Amino acid sequence: ARQVVEYINESLGGNLNIAYGLSLGGKILSRVLEINEVVIEHAIMDAAPLLSLPRWLVGPLKYLQCANVWSCYHWTGFWKWLFHSHYFDVLLDECKKIYPFGGSKAVLDGYTSVYTTKLESISGQDIHYWYGTKESFVAKPQVRHLKTLYPDTKIEIFKGMNHGQILVDHPEEVASRITRMQYEQDIIDTSID
């Protein structure tokens, strides 16, 4: 998150109109908003993990995720056979990009960070949280926590969707929603003049 803040400050003058983060990207976006050193006019966190897990669960889950990434990288054919969806093709491609550069240690460190940090505060002008109905059991506690920190959070729930599925299966819908946010902001800005 610190690197993102530095980039926004150095390259964009400290201001970003819209930011979208899915899952770990949403976690990073939440940290950028927590640091509160740049202006992000519209922030969309899609299924971002905002709460820490119980300590007893962190170890087993991070090793499970590491095994998942390792097997995605080494047994791609098995995963494609098991899951007949291009959603998993995207996941497999990501695993193949990441694993060779950091191996198990990078995956374990990443998941340890995700699973052990809790969002303590958040600042922003227009904050959105998206999730699919098939991931509600995980997303609802995140939403409750976010609403305690930022009561004006706009929640969007996508019927029949799982983790990240709206972006993978319907990228044009995500682009359309982001474009509408930009368009609505432009209308507000020109009406002030």
Model-inferred region functions:
Residues 161-172:
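Catalytic histidine-centered segment of alpha/beta-hydrolase-like enzymes
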Residues 1-18:
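Active-site loop/oxyanion-hole signature of alpha/beta-hydrolase fold enzymes
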Residues 125, 139-148:
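Short alpha-helix in the alpha/beta-hydrolase fold that links the catalytic acid
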Residues 34-35, 40-70:
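Flexible "cap/lid" loop of the alpha/beta hydrolase fold
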